[in-house]
Amino acid sequence: MWFSNLICYRFKQDVSYTQEDFDKALEQDLFRPCTGQELATFGWTKAFGKHGETLSHFSQKSILVCAKREEKVLPASVINELVAEKVDLIEAEENRPVKKKEKDELKENILHTLLPQAFKKSSLQFAFIDQENGWVVVNSGSFNKAEELLALLRKSLGTLPVVPAFANYDLDVFLTDWLTNFSTPEGFAIGSDAELEEADDSGAQVKLKGHDLSCDEVKSHLETGKRVTKLALDWQERVKFMLQNDGSIKRLSYSDTLKEENADIPKEDMAVKLDADFILASEEIKQLLEELTQGLGDIDDLA
């Protein structure tokens, strides 16, 4: 339940769900394994897996959901090799070149033959809805994967009026200003990792890891006009993360003190442990996001 990457959205209006209605909506799009000719499937599964009984998990005005993706593994190199072998055979036997349209048809036929026999791999995608403060937080470092989950949630619920949380902020400006002045909003401290980028079309990058970001070398990069696109931050000495200029929050690392708060719960009570960890992690993330947005300021004031 400890989210490691965050793609965040805000509701455009107040929302309120009951678990009965929410789960009933999710049941319309349950996960099912791939059948013969399907490349992939995507649907809802129990939020706590084998340790839970319901699709969603409601706790502390937050809702945890889990989507499962299954896809068949057909390496492009294998397909291309089989197509090439078939093309060589046709050209040798019929003494004629094989044109692109025919190659495409051969590829489709090979795919059709191999799909039922292909290996399958699966992955889980978690997200939680904060009904109180209007957040949707997806545990992903990819906007495409986050949008895929939101699309499924929107399909199940019928509507999902959300927008990317940080889309209207020019985060380059904030990150560059924070590092230039080595000053951050209250509760946040600058870490030791950053990425800087030339403002011109060259896009030349400087990647700093485990670095003293207050040193003269970094100041020199900033003075020549480089902008900060990624910056490591420490919030309240409880959560460390990398804030990126696209609005994603990556590499979350929770303090030992925080993670040990539920250490007294027996491993045998896994459902209780998962619930306690979800409450702990989601409450920390919600507070972090609220303080981060306060530090960035009201978007209307920045217009």
Curated annotation (Swiss-Prot):
The keyword Cytoplasm applies. GO terms for molecular function: double-stranded DNA binding. Its main location: cytoplasm. InterPro entries: RdgC. GO terms for biological process: DNA recombination; regulation of DNA recombination. It is found in: Cytoplasm, Nucleoid. HAMAP family: RdgC (MF_00194). Belongs to the RdgC family. May be involved in recombination. NCBIfam families: PRK00321.1-3 (NF001462), PRK00321.1-5 (NF001464). This is Recombination-associated protein RdgC. It comes from Pseudoalteromonas translucida (strain TAC 125). The lineage of its organism: Bacteria, Pseudomonadati, Pseudomonadota, Gammaproteobacteria, Alteromonadales.
